[in-house]
Amino acid sequence: TAEVMSXVTAXFGXALXE
């Protein structure tokens, strides 16, 4: 679902920021 993708995307965003 879009909700799940949002959370996954957030996690990737933080990882990429690192």
Swiss-Prot record:
GO biological process, one term: sensory perception of smell
Signal peptide (residue range): none
Alphabetic keyword roster: Olfaction, Sensory transduction, Transport
Domain of life of the source: Eukaryota
Presence of keyword Nucleotide-binding: no
Tissues in which the protein is found: Antenna.
Family membership noted in the UniProt record: Belongs to the PBP/GOBP family.
Function: Present in the aqueous fluid surrounding olfactory sensory dendrites and are thought to aid in the capture and transport of hydrophobic odorants into and through this fluid.
Name the record gives this protein: General odorant-binding protein
Species of provenance: Hyalophora cecropia (Cecropia moth)
Phylogenetic placement of the source organism: Eukaryota, Metazoa, Ecdysozoa, Arthropoda, Hexapoda
